[in-house]
Amino acid sequence: MIRKKSISIRSKKTTYDILIGRNLLKEKHTYLQLILADKKIAIISDETVHNLQYANFLDQISDLKVDPHLFLIEPGETSKNWNVLKKVLDWLTELNFDRTDYVIAFGGGVVGDLVSLAASLFRRGINLIQVPTTLLSQVDSSVGGKTAVNNGPAKNSIGTFYHPKVVFCDTSFLRTLPERAFLAGYAEVLKMALVFDKDFYKFLIENQKLISSRDEAILLHIIDKSLELKSKVVESDETEQGDRALLNFGHTFGHALETY
């Protein structure tokens, strides 16, 4: 059995754990039961993730005896805007959530960025749990506290810094990830290695076949190593005033190409 791993983010403003493994929500039943007891729970996801993985999600939390509310957005970058954000905030208001309740972001980077921003704004901050379902969101966007929506062509121009209470990087959700999306996440892993760790980069190059086959042990290792590298940067530069800007390597041209 593949060993589960965890990493702790410990910055000046916050402390939280990133849990890495398979079927984590089921394994962490006692922990979730403790923090979610007597709380309302809102799960926000997109239609694609819902169709492919929501049954898995519900199966893993079935022992919790919770009745979560569900809000779905359309998949893709076009949902990352102020109008969709307002719909999420209006929905939470209608459900009469308060800041002691929990919002769960269940999806890739678009869902994570949007829901994190909504959580930071709703009643000046509601409890947030990240359950990223893509390799890119597991190794990068779910960790570090950046939240955002786009403002027209200006990518990520409306946002805050707001951290989750816990992040579950569950490799079981990567089974149905399309190849293109998997490669997008692997590109982020390569970038992290290029910038911060030449030995990790060498490991990636030497193990490309195993990585492309999505070998479980290899996936666990590269997610763990990438988050270890990112966590060190986030802890030392939480609001991107210095070294954290190195994580933006490639973003200038990348965002321009995505937009135009």
Predicted regions and their residues:
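A glycine/threonine-rich phosphate-anchoring loop and its flanking beta-alpha core
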Residues: R10, L19, L117-L210
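Phosphate-handling active-site elements
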Residues: E94-T100, F122-Q130, Y260
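Glycine-rich beta-strand-to-loop/alpha-helix junction loops that act as flexible
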Residues: P75-G76, F106-G108, F249-G250
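Short glycine-rich anion-binding loops that position phosphate/pyrophosphate groups of nucleotides
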Residues: E47-V49, G108-V111
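Active-site segments that bind and position negatively charged phosphate/pyrophosphate groups
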Residues: K202, N207-Y260
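Short glycine/serine/threonine-rich phosphate/pyrophosphate-binding segments
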Residues: V110-L117, Q138, H255-A256
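ATP/NTP phosphate-donor binding region
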Residues: M1-Y102
